[in-house]
């Protein structure tokens, strides 16, 4: 499954993995998974977190290592983001629910994920997605970016 990923995708997932793997030990625990999900405005129960880990925990050790994480991401990409998942993700970023993701909202979510970005980096991310040039990302632009991944 993971062998169908490009080098770019793998290095992107490595970066995502390290956001989850707070203590850098090469494994994601339920505690670490919960921390990241809560920083994204989700509120999973302990049982839900355990289910998520069990779903991809091939060796049954109760944590997710990088190869298991890659398999999960490859699977997720195959049943590409349903309309509902995209709307949900957009809502996470669109804090004031005005239908747009501003630079401030993007910075806020990235900071919650432990990604300290400079103003330039945030502006660059907005510019890359901002098709109509209004300085923020609307839902259509967001979908384009997510589907291009």
Swiss-Prot record:
Ca(2+) 1 binds at residues 21, 23, 25, 27, 32. Residues 8-43, 44-79, 81-116, 117-149 form the EF-hand domain. This is Calmodulin-6. Interacts with KCBP. Ca(2+) 3 binds at residues 94, 96, 98, 105. Ca(2+) 4 binds at residues 130, 132, 134, 136, 141. This protein has four functional calcium-binding sites. GO terms for cellular component: cytosol; plastid. One of its GO terms (molecular function) is calcium ion binding. InterPro entries: CALM/Myosin/TropC-like, EF-hand-dom_pair, EF_Hand_1_Ca_BS, EF_hand_dom. Ca(2+) 2 binds at residues 57, 59, 61, 63, 68. Coiled coil: none annotated. Gene3D superfamilies: EF-hand (1.10.238.10). The keyword Ribonucleoprotein does not apply. Keywords: Calcium, Metal-binding, Repeat. One of its GO terms (biological process) is calcium-mediated signaling. Belongs to the calmodulin family. Calmodulin mediates the control of a large number of enzymes, ion channels and other proteins by Ca(2+). Among the enzymes to be stimulated by the calmodulin-Ca(2+) complex are a number of protein kinases and phosphatases.
